[in-house]
């Protein structure tokens, strides 16, 4: 069925205007993002094909632009729009979660970063910056690539911590393999960060390694 064959009230844009965004199905939301179909297929048909490709809508956030382009009817332009919408939603979610979040234990912090780090294909070194009440005041990815002591320099981490007037920091990095077991380099980086924090008066509360749906707290394991 082509889009002009659908009744006006059932078209995604008109449905949104009449009933609100919550009334739209996931396929209809995707249809609004990609905007147009092809000569032979409606935008809703293509959008539904995208939804069916993944086990659930949440899986879309881990797809690459190339994976979206494997769907018949999706080229680079439409795939880019989908990726942009997903990334915008992710960033909004980060800001919302960050507001007045108090970190009382490693699990609190992991809930904040796990969605972002668990399924990345490269190692990312990420920091949370906290105030004296252990509230998250800022977060940032500091390094991307293999974690080693020559790349992760405490100077870069604590320069930002001082700029944000942080009282303490929590560091994270992911293991793309999914296994959060620390390497010797992980432990060396942690030791250097803890020592630098003691010098500048900003405590390293923890260094947590993120795997696929699991993590290891180096503080809890007694590594520093």
Curated annotation (Swiss-Prot):
It comes from the Bacteria. It holds the Pfam family UPF0758_N. Zn(2+) binds at residues 173, 175, 186. One of its GO terms (molecular function) is metal ion binding. PROSITE patterns: MPN (PS50249), UPF0758 (PS01302). Keywords: Hydrolase, Metal-binding, Metalloprotease, Protease, Zinc. One of its GO terms (biological process) is proteolysis. Residues 102-224 form the MPN domain. A motif (JAMM motif) lies at residues 173-186. This is UPF0758 protein Lm4b_01560. It comes from Listeria monocytogenes serotype 4b (strain CLIP80459).
């Amino acid at each position: 069925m082509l889009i002009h064959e659908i009744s006006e009230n059932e078209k995604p844009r008109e449905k949104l205007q009449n009933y609100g965004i919550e009334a739209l199905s996931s396929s209809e939301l995707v249809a609004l993002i990609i905007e147009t179909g092809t000569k032979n297929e409606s935008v809703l048909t293509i959008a539904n094909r995208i939804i069916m490709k993944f086990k659930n809508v949440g899986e879309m956030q881990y797809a690459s632009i190339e994976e979206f382009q494997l769907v018949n009817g999706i080229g680079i332009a439409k795939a880019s729009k989908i990726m942009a919408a997903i990334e915008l939603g992710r960033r909004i979610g980060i800001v919302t979660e960050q507001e007045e979040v108090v970190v009382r234990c490693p699990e609190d912090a992991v809930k904040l970063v796990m969605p972002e780090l668990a399924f990345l294909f490269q190692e990312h070194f990420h920091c949370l910056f906290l105030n004296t009440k252990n509230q998250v005041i800022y977060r940032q990815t500091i390094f991307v690539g293999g974690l080693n002591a020559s790349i992760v320099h405490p100077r870069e981490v604590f320069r930002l911590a001082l700029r944000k007037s942080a009282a303490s920091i929590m560091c994270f990095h992911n293991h793309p393999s999914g296994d959060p077991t620390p390497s010797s380099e992980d432990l060396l980086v942690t030791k250097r960060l803890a020592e630098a924090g003691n010098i500048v008066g900003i405590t390293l509360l923890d260094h947590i390694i993120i795997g696929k749906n699991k993590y290891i707290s180096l503080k809890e394991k007694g590594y520093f």
